[in-house]
């Protein structure tokens, strides 16, 4: 079996000479087998290893015994041991997620922490061939694309490694028995409360008995074949993503040209955009991809809500994917501005300079959209900065009647999601300047103007 593990390691370039490896160890057969084998291979690869164990505080005394077992196992082999105790159920309740998901987040965060403390460059996880088969089967049942069928990667992110990924669970259990390792058995793995356990305990044994004795091998081979095809499509999609997508802090704009691509590529472009925004593709299903594609075929202004607090909207054929913002405060924030000083509005990351111009030669009417001039007497003393409110109206320069601010934004082709971010300079409560775009007819300089007001708006650096 050790030779099979070495073959997996070398085939996937998992371990190089002088690597420092954190081994994730629960105390069960898989992780104890992995730790023991990597200990035996220390001299071959000239590696340093440590063990990281998380006590989830779910199974009471049994969890404490798991921790004690792993600690003593490490002491016996003189392996450095790191442990974290955390109430996973409490964290799950606070974050409103399942205990299973909370446990995974906590474990992987701890592995990363130990990686830094141990100055490691690899983290070894004990997934095996049966885990791979169960994962693929579970995703097929739930509904997945090729990305899900490819299963668990032998190497992820260049440093998460799975040396047992091609080893059957039966071989692992035999190794533990032959080496007299006496691993801990997690009783919850025998409960049928989780779908994965039902697949392991009921479905796969049923398929083995009635359809295919080597279903584990068949599912693993399926994963390998799909990985080859999927990796090629991902490579194409990556180049198309760079060509058609523009990333901002909380937004990705997918240009309309992207939607002429084949659906196999387009769906991957969309998934990449989602991953950029929320660092996860969890909960993103085919129906959501289809909704985004449908939104692009609709008229400008069409928008849809998506999982993970995202929204997509059509902006003249381009699709803007963004994180939804709290709109409850839109139009309610208002900031008083003062004459002859730089007004810093730190909350909005803005600096607004206001001063009286005494010499008309100082006026620069052309070339800077962030500096505008107004009749100071018309402006009055009450100057504020705010954002749009429902029912706002504005009289654009050169016109004699008010227009709805909403209609002005539409005519300017300002995306719906950007409209809430445009600062408005107001005099006595009336909009005088849609910053970056238009000034009001009501406060313009004319032949009767005696005092000129200069307002300059900038972003804080």
Swiss-Prot record:
Its EC number is 6.3.4.19. It is an enzyme of class 6 (ligase). Pfam families: ATP_bind_3 (PF01171), TilS_C (PF11734). Gene3D superfamilies: 1.20.59.20, HUPs. One of its GO terms (biological process) is tRNA modification. CDD domains: TilS_N. GO terms for molecular function: ATP binding; tRNA(Ile)-lysidine synthase activity. Belongs to the tRNA(Ile)-lysidine synthase family. NCBIfam families: lysidine_TilS_C (TIGR02433), lysidine_TilS_N (TIGR02432). This is tRNA(Ile)-lysidine synthase. The gene is tilS.
